[in-house]
Amino acid sequence: MVKALSARFLPSPLRAGWAFFCLTLLLSPPALAAECVILLHGLARTEASMNTLAEALEAADYWVVNYHYPSTSQTIEELAQQAIEAGTAQCDPGSDKVHFVTHSKGGILVRQYLHDNTIDKLGRVVMLGPPNQGSEVVDKLAAVPGFELINGPAGLQLGTGQWSVPNNLGPANFEVGVIAGSRSINLILSTLLPDRDDGKVTVENTRLEGMRDHITLPVTHPFMMRNPTVIEQVIYFLRHGTFRKTGPLPR
């Protein structure tokens, strides 16, 4: 049987070296801390909506950037350039990978940016309730007085028509998993949607050509990013590139 080498049996110079090695191990950050995760909230929300998810990712040893951007003040093209570049600049310079976890419109910002740009060390992307094919809610309410005031120019770009931004960005050219919600707490908006939905986006319209994986969970659009199962699936996808379909999720 091989026994562990005890430092007290080492010569004095080696003892000092052993102590330094052990101290280095104790002070070294966990391996996953070298991976950065940028969080992008949805339309008319703030970074506070992603706080629960941010805390869970930090507990999983990721470097987390929970970035706030003025979601109702500019177009998707302008917001994408601003948010992605500012977010990546806040990652640890030593990060081996840069992941994204987005809610709703935040996913469209990532698609818009990667349509025209590349990101060094890009890892995986998880989108929560993204209107990847637009939302019928925008189609039917865009002309209603006050809609643009509340949702801004970017909100008007999220319809389902051929003119909408999501429908002009093409297939995913990056590794992405999509989580859709199938419950609604907004029954009025759900009446405007033709299929299973989360109160803002149909399950079908969250799908994106070229995506790596897709799951539907019984969660609502406004609060899915706080749901424990959603959070577990986010972390699982970041680590494995797929969602967990059967059995309990590892803790």
Description of each model-found segment:
Residues 2-18:
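Bacterial N-terminal signal peptides that target proteins for export
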Residues 7, 11-12, 93, 155-158, ...:
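Generic preference for hydrophobic/aromatic residues in regular secondary structure cores
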Residues 28-30:
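N-terminal signal peptide c-region/cleavage motif recognized by signal peptidases
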Residues 35-41, 45-48, 52, 58-70, ...:
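Serine-dependent carboxylesterase/thioesterase catalytic core
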Residues 115-251:
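Helical cap/lid subdomain of alpha/beta-hydrolase-fold lipid enzymes
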